[in-house]
Amino acid sequence: MPHVPTVDIRRLGDIRFDTQLERALRPSPDYDVSQWLFVPNQYTEYRYILGTRGQKPLICIGINPSTARPGDLDPTLKSVERVAKANSFDSFIMFNVYAQRATSPDDMERTCNPELHRENMRAFAYALSLNPRPVVWAAWGTIIEKRDYLWPCLEDMIALGREYGARWVTCGRRSKAGHPHHPLYLRADAQAEPFDVEEYVRAQQARAAAAVSGRPRRV
């Protein structure tokens, strides 16, 4: 079943990443915590992290989470797992530019929830800290154009990645607009290639500015 947001995350109580991580590290009746990292550790309106345990994880960045959970991966996550193995990673971490669950990006919040974003960045810092040489796979596709607030969120992630010495990669052909390929429909043996994420953002900013300047002025 697709996930359609029905509850304002602001009403869910304590969404702090540190609190949710502490709970996620405890034994769970629903999955093996020695094999899975799932934060929060129950299905809810947001998700910070879903991944497998290992010493060398590939951090995959999408736009926002859908319905996947430990032991019940959706097609996107199954593809992420295959590509991680094909590129010699022993595990994967699925992360997102924005943490709100919504199967259709059209159902995402119209404005950014600053608390959710702040805690999502704490989650990203944690994911980066799991590997002394973190590798981050840009995999958000064209969906990043769905909400204007996604760009500042991504820029915060890039800044954090810089602090941790992250190496950015992408897989598959980019879109005509230059966006990195979404994990769906990638070959199982798709190889990761270097991705200059800062140059990508500059190019997208220039493209947006050109589009605005080309619009007819209102009289």
For the regions a protein language model found, what residue spans apply to each?
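Short acidic (Asp/Glu) patches
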Residues: T44, L73-E81, P114-A123
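Glycine/proline-rich loop-helix segments at beta-alpha junctions forming the active-site rim
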Residues: P2-T6, M108-V219
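A short mixed-secondary-structure module that forms the rim of ligand-binding clefts
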Residues: S66-S88
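A short, flexible beta-alpha/helix-coil linker loop
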Residues: N64-T67, Q100, I143
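Active-site and ligand/interface coordination hotspots across diverse enzymes
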Residues: M1-D74, V219
